[in-house]
């Protein structure tokens, strides 16, 4: 059986015989006379089951703007094909949000708050969740990788323009990350974490916010949920919006103020938000991909990217 035949079998198991199929990113839109479905692929059963459970918890806690997961005529909700897993969801009639639109950014921020509030008291031990809440460990790993890259570059006989630029800025990046670690340690971050750990979405990209025809923001794709704290989710979203808006600090203030309107941040949480955004994330990530993972990346394009991000990341 090929993939198309497999999809056809899935659709027919829902009592649908005549339909059109379109691919959008990593999902398939099934359009029939009676209804529209979405078929999504999952690389692991864990992500699939976590998604189902988190949707159930959100609905129970009155978080309305999410997709439904559908069972077929045999009361099955997922299907396996070549070690991949597929499930059917309701189709949200709308479009991806525009993260250069201030009004839509604010709507997304409120949706993030509502998601956190709906999920903050969930303790479902049947869910297998990645715990990536140890910021200090992650930042220390970044420093280790930067030293590794620095050591490699010191052994290169003839440095390229890219090599020189990266080498000249490594110490500055290490210093910034070290300062963040010091702030976390001085404020007893581990104690804070033990008291404030919740389930986070962890994938708050603009394509996971759908602006419905009813002008409501729908949150989708819960396959990447993890354990962290609410500042983590918000700061990661803010960073993505910030980078897409040419490093306009006003959008950071807008995001913080909207969330803070509903949930009053403590002084330390404000410090966490600011610290996360001071992390030279792109400098570390791009360097790691090129120098440690040995990804085949055009050096000139990479150099231009690094220069663009470093204007902000290494000069705060």
Give residue spans per PLM region:
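Active-site activation/catalytic loop segments of kinase-like enzymes and analogous catalytic loops
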Residues: 231-264, 277-296
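ATP-dependent phospho-/nucleotidyl transfer catalytic cores
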Residues: 20-21, 42-45, 97, 126-199, ...
């Amino acid at each position: 059986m090929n993939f198309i035949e497999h999809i056809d079998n899935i659709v027919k198991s829902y009592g649908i015989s005549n339909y059109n199929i379109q691919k959008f990113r990593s999902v398939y839109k099934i359009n029939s006379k009676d209804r529209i479905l979405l078929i999504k692929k999952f690389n692991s059963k864990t992500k699939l089951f976590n998604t189902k459970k988190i949707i159930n918890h959100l609905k129970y806690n009155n978080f309305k703007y999410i997709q439904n997961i559908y069972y077929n005529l045999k009361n099955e909700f997922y299907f396996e094909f070549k070690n991949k897993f597929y499930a059917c969801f309701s189709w949200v009639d709308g479009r991806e949000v525009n993260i250069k639109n201030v009004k839509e950014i604010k709507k997304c921020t409120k949706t993030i708050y509502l998601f956190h509030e709906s999920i903050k008291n969930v303790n479902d031990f049947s869910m297998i969740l990645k715990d990536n809440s140890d910021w200090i460990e992650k930042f220390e790993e970044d420093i280790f990788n930067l030293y590794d890259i620095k050591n490699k570059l010191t052994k290169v006989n003839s440095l390229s323009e890219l090599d020189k630029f990266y080498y000249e800025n490594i110490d500055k990046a290490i210093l910034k990350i070290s300062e963040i670690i010091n702030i976390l340690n001085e404020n007893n971050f581990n104690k804070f974490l033990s008291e404030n750990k919740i389930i986070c979405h962890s994938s708050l990209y603009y394509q996971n916010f759908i602006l419905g025809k009813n002008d409501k923001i729908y949150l989708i794709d819960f396959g990447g949920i993890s354990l962290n704290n609410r500042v983590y989710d918000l700061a990661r979203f803010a960073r993505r919006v910030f980078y897409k808006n040419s490093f306009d600090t006003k959008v950071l203030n807008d995001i913080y103020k909207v969330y803070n309107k509903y949930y009053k941040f403590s002084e330390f949480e404000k410090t966490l938000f600011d610290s996360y955004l001071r992390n030279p994330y792109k400098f570390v990530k791009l360097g790691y991909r090129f120098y440690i993972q040995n990804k085949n990346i055009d050096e000139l394009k990479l150099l231009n990217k690094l220069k663009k991000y470093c204007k902000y990341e290494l000069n705060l």
